[in-house]
Amino acid sequence: MHNFTDMRDENSHDEIWLVEHYPVFTQGQAGKAEHILMPGDIPVVQSDRGGQVTYHGPGQQVMYVLLNLKRRKLGVRDLVTLLEQTVVNTLAEIGIEAHPRADAPGVYVGEKKICSLGLRIRRGCSFHGLALNVNMDLSPFLRINPCGYAGMEMAKITQWKEDATTDNIAPRLLANILALLNNPPYEYIAA
C-alpha cells in the first residue's frame, strides 16, 4: 500500500484492495496509549493512518482505497462521506438500516459501531480505508477503547444477517463504492 502510493504517478490507475487480517490492534497517528487497555497476546502495530486504536481480525472486511483524490476532484471529507455511504448502501441491500454520525466517523447500527474508518493522504492520493465487521469475534474490542471512545459498543453484520460472510459482502462493498465513484463496470477477482 505504501509502495504503491509512493510509486504512483498521474497516470497510475486507482486500486481498491479487499483483505482480512490476522488479529492485530492498530494505533493511528492520533492514538493515545491509554486507549489500549489489555492487548494480551494480540500485537499492537503503529499505523500512519488517522484516528485512534482499532482491532482487525478474521471475519472483518478491510477495504483499502488507493485513490488519486486530485484527479477525482475529491476532498478528504468527501472521501469519508463516500466511504460511509458505501457501507450504508451495502448494509441496506441486506436489510440492515445503518447511518454515519457527525461526532464520530464510521457507520453505526443504532448506537453500535459496525464500521471504522482511518485514512492517510499523501501527494493528493489516499490509502488505508475502512474495516467492516462481518462475522468476527468482537471480544478483542473489549481490550481497547475503540477509536478512542471508552465503552464504545461494537457490532457485526451477523447480529442481523446470520449467513453473512466476507465472501458474500466483499463483492457488494466493491460494487457500491464503484457506483458512488461513477466508475465503469468491473470484474471482481477473488484471490
Curated annotation (Swiss-Prot):
Superkingdom, taxonomy of origin: Bacteria
Site (Lowers pKa of active site Cys) location in chain: 113
BPL/LPL catalytic domain boundaries: 10-185
Gene Ontology terms: biological process: protein modification process
CDD domains: LipB (cd16444)
Pathway: Protein modification; protein lipoylation via endogenous pathway; protein N(6)-(lipoyl)lysine from octanoyl-[acyl-carrier-protein]: step 1/2
Reactions mediated catalytically: octanoyl-[ACP] + L-lysyl-[protein] = N(6)-octanoyl-L-lysyl-[protein] + holo-[ACP] + H(+)
Binding locations of substrate: 49-56, 116-118, 129-131
EC number(s) recorded for this UniProt protein: 2.3.1.181
Location relative to the cell: Cytoplasm
Keyword hit for Protease: no
Keywords: Acyltransferase, Cytoplasm, Transferase
One of the record's GO molecular function terms: lipoyl(octanoyl) transferase activity
GO CC terms: cytoplasm
Family the UniProt entry places it in: Belongs to the LipB family.
Function noted in UniProt: Catalyzes the transfer of endogenously produced octanoic acid from octanoyl-acyl-carrier-protein onto the lipoyl domains of lipoate-dependent enzymes. Lipoyl-ACP can also act as a substrate although octanoyl-ACP is likely to be the physiological substrate.
Further comment: In the reaction, the free carboxyl group of octanoic acid is attached via an amide linkage to the epsilon-amino group of a specific lysine residue of lipoyl domains of lipoate-dependent enzymes.
Annotated NCBIfam families: lipB, PRK14342.1
Protein name: Octanoyltransferase
